[in-house]
């Protein structure tokens, strides 16, 4: 009888210890940096109680990770093709279908595209 009572007390002690540890120790999240940034208080330009739009959240996450399109890329004077008004597909000479990808009319690898007016 005393052995079963000791087992019950030991079980209760283990359960109580487990619960007290699991409540006080936070489990690290996979996206800890993003969560910290999004939950941070006192962000410049943000008032308390104001919810951010999904685009604003995405912008902030991209800025944090340094994955964004730079202003150098968006300059107006940088054109990908030197021929004004030319399609990007007709811009550079060379092999158009370098690897086995789908063939379409716009890449001019499809058969009988001469009669199609674009």
Swiss-Prot record:
Molecular function via GO: hormone activity
PTM description: Proteolytically cleaved, probably by S1P, a subtilisin-like serine protease (subtilase).
Site (described: Required for proteolytic cleavage): 59-60
Any single Pfam family the record assigns to this protein: RALF
Cystine pairs: 81-91, 103-109
A GO CC term attached to the entry: apoplast
Signal sequence, start to end: 1-22
Propeptide segments, given as residue ranges: 23-63
Domain of life: Eukaryota
GO biological process, one term: calcium-mediated signaling
Phosphoprotein found in the keyword field: no
InterPro entries, sorted: RALF
Location of this chain's protein in the cell: Secreted
Keywords assigned by UniProt, alphabetized: Disulfide bond, Hormone, Secreted, Signal
PANTHER family per UniProt: PROTEIN RALF-LIKE 24, RAPID ALKALINIZATION FACTOR-LIKE
Function as written in the Swiss-Prot or TrEMBL entry: Cell signaling peptide that may regulate plant stress, growth, and development. Mediates a rapid alkalinization of extracellular space by mediating a transient increase in the cytoplasmic Ca(2+) concentration leading to a calcium-dependent signaling events through a cell surface receptor and a concomitant activation of some intracellular mitogen-activated protein kinases.
Protein family (similarity comment): Belongs to the plant rapid alkalinization factor (RALF) family.
Protein name: Protein RALF-like 24
Protein species of origin: Arabidopsis thaliana
Taxonomic placement: Eukaryota, Viridiplantae, Streptophyta, Embryophyta, Tracheophyta
Gene: RALFL24
